[in-house]
Amino acid sequence: MTVVRGVSALLRVFCIAMLAAGLGVALQPAAVTGAARAAGYESLMVPSAAMGRDIPVAFLAGGPHA
C-alpha cells in the first residue's frame, strides 16, 4: 500500500511541476516589434428600397486591386 501512495504522490508532484512550467511559458509576454493598429476601412450607408432602410457597408483598405 505504501508503494501505491508513493507513486501517487510522485505523480501529483510531477503533474503540478508540468502545470507550473506550462503556465510560466503561456503567461510570458510576446515580443512586441512595433505599434499594432487595425487596418483602415471606409464605412458607407447604402439605401435599400426592398428593405426600406439604409444598410451599413464597410470596405477594407488595400487588397490586390487597391
From Swiss-Prot:
Its main location: secreted. The keyword Hydrolase does not apply. The keyword Cytoplasm does not apply. Keywords: Acyltransferase, Secreted, Signal, Transferase. Residues 1-38 form the signal peptide. It is found in: Secreted. GO terms for molecular function: acyltransferase activity. One of its GO terms (cellular component) is extracellular region. Homodimer. May have a role in host tissue attachment, whereby ligands may include the serum protein fibronectin and small sugars. Belongs to the mycobacterial A85 antigen family. This is MPT51 antigen. It comes from Mycobacterium avium. The gene is mpt51.
